[in-house]
């Protein structure tokens, strides 16, 4: 990560449905007068790091689009806004309107799991789900209050890459 950037939210999610979680970082400095200092600005570019395997991530740096914009971001909500099978990101910003980063680049197969309890925990908050597919085991949990001024989709999304079937769900 860049020392000149001030991170306000970090989330792992599978941006490309390849079964590996990538990393989104919302940035924006906390002090509006920070521009008095060299190499530091109040609005900053958010970042996306793609999981390239073996514990390594590479930053995806676009030349245009929402990730190229400088904003004062504070939180982010993750979910499939347009219901097309990939995770979109809605970013809460301080000095501008929210930014919807619509994801249209994911190509792998996927499954979405919505849990529904019968008692007081209707949304299944805290439930842990394992998906076994294509020789991989993925684990995710239903979480509430995931980010500042933001709430991510409570449905769990698992990218399956090229796998044609799910072996088991626990």
Language-model features, listed with the residues they occupy:
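Residue-level recognition of alpha-helix boundary/capping or hinge positions
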Residues: 8, 34-38, 112
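Acidic/hydrophobic-patterned starts of short beta strands in beta-sheet-rich repeat architectures
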Residues: 17-26, 84-92
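Structural signature of eukaryotic scaffold interfaces centered on beta-propeller domains
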Residues: 12-17, 79-83
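Short charge-dense sequence patches
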Residues: 1-4, 26, 30, 78
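Gly/Ser/Thr/Pro-enriched helix-cap/hinge segments flanking short amphipathic alpha-helices
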Residues: 3, 44-47, 51-170
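Conserved beta-strand position repeated once per blade in WD40 beta-propeller domains
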Residues: 9-12, 75
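Short, conserved, GDST-rich strand-edge loop motifs in beta-rich repeat architectures
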Residues: 26-43
């Amino acid at each position: 990560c860049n020392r000149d950037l001030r991170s306000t939210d970090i989330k792992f999610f599978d941006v490309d449905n390849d079964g590996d979680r990538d990393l989104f970082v919302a940035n924006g400095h906390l002090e509006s007068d920070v521009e008095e200092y060299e190499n530091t600005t109040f609005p900053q570019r958010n970042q996306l790091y793609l999981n390239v395997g073996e514990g390594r991530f590479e930053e995806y740096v676009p030349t245009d689009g929402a990730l190229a914009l400088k904003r004062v971001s504070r939180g982010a909500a993750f979910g499939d806004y347009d219901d097309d099978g990939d995770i979109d990101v809605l970013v809460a910003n301080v000095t501008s309107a929210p930014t919807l980063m619509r994801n249209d680049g994911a190509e792998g197969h996927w499954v979405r799991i919505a849990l529904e309890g019968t008692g007081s925990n209707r949304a299944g908050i805290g439930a842990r789900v394992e998906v076994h597919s294509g020789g991989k085991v993925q684990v995710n949990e239903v979480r509430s209050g995931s980010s500042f001024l933001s709430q991510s989709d409570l449905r769990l999304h698992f990218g399956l890459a090229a796998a044609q079937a799910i072996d088991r769900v626990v």
